[in-house]
Amino acid sequence: MSLLRNRLQDLPALCLCVLVLACIGACQSEAYEGTPSPPPKLKMSHWSLVTGRMKELLEPVLKRTRDRWQWFWSPSTFRGFMQTYYDDHLRDLGPRTKAWLLKSKESLLNKTHSLCPRIVCGDKDQG
């Protein structure tokens, strides 16, 4: 049972890794589209056959992933996300920061004044 729980905890990290690999593959396939084909001698090597087969297997998956996530990478979607994030978290950051600094300053001054009679001035009750 605990093994299943550990696997479920690792699922988001695994999904993120798969997404990153898919994005990298999509970007690389776009970069290689304009490159010339390798010379015939290299074309027949074992490694080129392996890479060719892997490309043949992964290309449809990458194309589907790229097509499905195209809406996310569009400027309007990303701009909308950033605007929402700003509205939710950063719009009133200046006033909140000023209020926090004033509160912290007042708290620090109050603590300092409460310590002053004991440390610097001595107890008022003793004198």
From Swiss-Prot:
Its main location: secreted. Pfam families: APOC4. InterPro entries: APOC4. The keyword Transport applies. Keywords: Lipid transport, Secreted, Signal, Transport. Transmembrane segments: none annotated. GO terms for biological process: lipid transport; positive regulation of triglyceride storage; triglyceride homeostasis. GO terms for cellular component: high-density lipoprotein particle; very-low-density lipoprotein particle. Residues 1-27 form the signal peptide. It is found in: Secreted. Belongs to the apolipoprotein C4 family. May participate in lipoprotein metabolism. This is Apolipoprotein C-IV. The lineage of its organism: Eukaryota, Metazoa, Chordata, Craniata, Vertebrata.
